[in-house]
Structures are given as structure tokens and as C-alpha cells.
Amino acid sequence: NLYQFKNMIQCANHGRRATWHYLDYGCYCGPGGLGTPVDELDRCCKTHDDCYIEAGKKGCFP
């Protein structure tokens, strides 16, 4: 969810940039996702997206 996304971004960037700067960052931070993550932060967003996809397959929508 967006609250978790905000916390993840703040932890990853140590508060250097506002969270909203990352709503359209790389290939996976923000809605959708396709391709190869551009860096560690984008890879973290991909992992988060993948987790939601797997949870949805099991009928769980956190």
C-alpha cells in the first residue's frame, strides 16, 4: 500500500528526497512495472510488487 511504499522510500533514501519524487521512478517504483530494475531502490520496488502479485494469486489482498 502507499503507506508501506512511503516508509520503504524514506528508509532507502535516508530522507534525502521527498517520497513523491519516487512515484514514477525507474521501472518499478509507482504503478505498473516492466523491464530490468535500474538500481537497488528500483529492485526493492520490484520485490514489493512481486510480493503483492503472489499474495493476490493466493487470494490475499493486503
Curated annotation (Swiss-Prot):
UniProt cross-references to SMART domains, sorted A to Z: PA2c
Biological-process GO terms, alphabetical: arachidonate secretion; lipid catabolic process; phospholipid metabolic process
Reaction(s) catalysed (UniProt annotation): a 1,2-diacyl-sn-glycero-3-phosphocholine + H2O = a 1-acyl-sn-glycero-3-phosphocholine + a fatty acid + H(+)
Annotated compartments: Secreted
Cofactor binding, per record: Binds 1 Ca(2+) ion.
Protein name according to UniProt: Phospholipase A2 superbin a
Organism: Austrelaps superbus
Keyword ATP-binding: no
Sites where the protein binds Ca(2+): Y28, G30, G32, D49
GO MF annotations in UniProt: calcium ion binding; calcium-dependent phospholipase A2 activity; phospholipid binding; toxin activity
Family: Belongs to the phospholipase A2 family. Group I subfamily. D49 sub-subfamily.
Disulfide bond residue pairs: C29-C45
Keywords, comma-separated and alphabetical: Calcium, Disulfide bond, Hemostasis impairing toxin, Hydrolase, Lipid degradation, Lipid metabolism, Metal-binding, Platelet aggregation inhibiting toxin, Secreted, Toxin
Cited Pfam families: Phospholip_A2_1
Cellular component terms (Gene Ontology): extracellular region
Active site residues per record: H48
EC number: 3.1.1.4
Tissue: Expressed by the venom gland.
CDD domains, per database record: PLA2c
Needed co-factor(s): Ca(2+)
Stated role: Snake venom phospholipase A2 (PLA2) that inhibits collagen-induced platelet aggregation. In terms of inhibition of platelet aggregation, superbin a is more potent as superbin b, c, and d. PLA2 catalyzes the calcium-dependent hydrolysis of the 2-acyl groups in 3-sn-phosphoglycerides.
